[in-house]
Amino acid sequence: MAKKPTQDFESTLKELEAIVSHLETGELPLEEALNEFETAVKLVQQGQERLQKAEQRIQILLNKNDQAELSDYE
C-alpha cells in the first residue's frame, strides 16, 4: 500500500479538527470511532514533528543572528 503523502501543517490541523468534531457527536459505531481516533493520533504526531522542525529552523536562524533572542510566548 502506498504511503499517503504528508500534508502541510494547516491541512493536518483541519483534518484533525474534523475528526474531533465527528468523534464528539458520539454517533459513530465503536470500530469507526477507533479508526478515527487512530487517524487522529497519527495526525497529532505529524503536527508535532512539523512544529519541532519549525522550531529547529527558527533556532538555526536565530543562532546565525546573535542579536536576536528566542523567548517563551506568553
UniProtKB/Swiss-Prot annotation:
One of its GO terms (molecular function) is exodeoxyribonuclease VII activity. Its main location: cytoplasm. Bidirectionally degrades single-stranded DNA into large acid-insoluble oligonucleotides, which are then degraded further into small acid-soluble oligonucleotides. Pfam families: Exonuc_VII_S. Heterooligomer composed of large and small subunits. Keywords: Cytoplasm, Exonuclease, Hydrolase, Nuclease. NCBIfam families: PRK00977.1-1 (NF002137), PRK00977.1-4 (NF002140), xseB (TIGR01280). Belongs to the XseB family. SUPFAM superfamilies: XseB-like (SSF116842). It is found in: Cytoplasm. It comes from Actinobacillus pleuropneumoniae serotype 5b (strain L20). GO terms for cellular component: cytosol; exodeoxyribonuclease VII complex. Its EC number is 3.1.11.6. Disulfide bonds: none annotated. One of its GO terms (biological process) is DNA catabolic process. This is Exodeoxyribonuclease 7 small subunit. It is an enzyme of class 3 (hydrolase). It comes from the Bacteria. InterPro entries: Exonuc_VII_S, Exonuc_VII_ssu_sf. It catalyses: Exonucleolytic cleavage in either 5'- to 3'- or 3'- to 5'-direction to yield nucleoside 5'-phosphates.
